[in-house]
């Protein structure tokens, strides 16, 4: 069974088109394939406003500001297999408002920014982090490989 992307659009600032959903599904498939993971996972993806992601960031991370993406893994870090019987990889929450801001700031397309945020979040769901510089470099390298494979190169 292919990857399942469960979408919850809770923002009204930007219309989420089917083309974008397909791109984000491709991000999931490509990221999992790059890591050699089975593609049979379900990922929950919520599109939210800056206000909502700030509330989530405060609640779950103790940081009182709007961030671009939050990742909530449902995979057991010790063995890489999902906890429970269902193959739920985790939840991704993207501030679409922040993605628009960052696309302008970095002077690339909204689609490239959303693709990057999805890939970045997926690597978190698969157990990667960027707390240490070496971890950050490794994660960034993997993200760039996946984004390049998807055709989402820096403009």
From Swiss-Prot:
GO terms for biological process: rRNA processing. The lineage of its organism: Bacteria, Bacillati, Bacillota, Clostridia, Peptostreptococcales. It is found in: Cytoplasm. Its EC number is 3.1.-.-. NCBIfam families: rRNA maturation RNase YbeY. It comes from Alkaliphilus metalliredigens (strain QYMF). Zn(2+) binds at residues 120, 124, 130. Its main location: cytoplasm. GO terms for cellular component: cytoplasm. This is Endoribonuclease YbeY. Binds 1 zinc ion. Its cofactor is Zn(2+). Belongs to the endoribonuclease YbeY family.
């Amino acid at each position: 069974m292919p990857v399942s992307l469960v979408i919850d659009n809770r923002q009204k600032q930007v219309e989420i088109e089917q083309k974008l959903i397909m791109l984000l599904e491709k991000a999931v498939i490509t990221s999992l394939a790059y890591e050699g993971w089975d593609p049979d996972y379900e990922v929950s993806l919520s599109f939210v406003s800056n206000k909502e992601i700030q509330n989530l960031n405060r609640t779950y991370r103790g940081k009182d500001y709007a961030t671009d993406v939050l990742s909530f893994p449902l995979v057991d870090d010790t063995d890489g297999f999902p906890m429970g019987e269902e193959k739920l990889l985790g939840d991704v929450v993207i501030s679409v408002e922040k993605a628009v801001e960052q696309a302008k700031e970095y002077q690339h397309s909204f689609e490239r920014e959303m693709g990057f945020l999805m890939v970045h979040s997926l690597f978190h769901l698969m157990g990667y982090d960027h707390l240490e510089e070496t971890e950050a470099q490794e994660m960034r390298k993997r993200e760039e490989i996946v984004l390049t494979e998807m055709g989402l190169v820096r403009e």
